[in-house]
Amino acid sequence: MTWSWFPYHPLRLLRACYVSGMDPLAGSQWSAPGTVAGFAQSAPNAVLMAFAKEELRRAGSSRVLDLGCGAGRNAVPLARLGWTVVGTDLSWPMLCAAAARAREDRLDDRLYVVLAPMERIPARDRSFDLVIAHGIWNLARSATEFRRALSEAARVAKPGAGLFVFTFSRNTLPAEAEPVAGEPFVFTQFSGEPQCFLTEAQLRAELDRAGFAPDPGVRFREYNLPRPGTLSTGRVPVIYEAAFRREP
């Protein structure tokens, strides 16, 4: 059996975590046992949960895509709320942890995990009532990858679907920091690896170009801003949090 909106067998997706030794992120921090355990113990985003509750009341159905779901920090609570959740990630250990949590909470009929990159989502057009990009788009290594990820999110979102964004702000870095050559918002100064740090204007423009309009129901927030006169926050990123909506 397959879902008409998602051409994969859900049980196979869940069980794949336990039988596959393939891990695209093997050896990276994202698949390290300590990192996975830390993510598995992290509390869900309270603002996201409140937004998801309202979206569940508004939507005629209840399908949510959690991009970069990790160990299920938000995906498991979303399933508990009543959403049918598809969580994607590129770390097998993270997906295994999310699947294990779903089984422990008897939510394996509501949470399905898939090994997939954010710019190639294995779902049909207009499949989801809510899309979550929580700490994932900032990991894009180029503007091209970032824009493809936004385009994919727009493709699989139903018209009017909500989008919850949690991503790095340009204010994380000193004003004099220079982006990677040829890139408008990709920097290496934070971690040594290319990552996306957009200004608010850039983020809004990119989402508008992809077909997402701001949702006034969730205030655009910026967390961890440095105090006046401080140029850098050190190892703590400044974070944007906002909601948007897929335009018809």
Feature names for model-found ranges:
Residues 72-120:
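Class I SAM-dependent methyltransferase SAM/SAH-binding core
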Residues 119-131:
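A short acidic, Gly/Pro-enriched loop at the edge of an enzyme's catalytic core
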Residues 13-70, 164-188:
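Conserved class I S-adenosyl-L-methionine
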Residues 194-211:
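Short alpha-helix
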Residues 130-144:
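A short SAM/SAH-binding and catalytic strip from SAM-dependent methyltransferases
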Residues 147-159:
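A short glycine-rich, Lys/Arg-flanked "PGG" loop and its adjoining helix->strand segment in the class I
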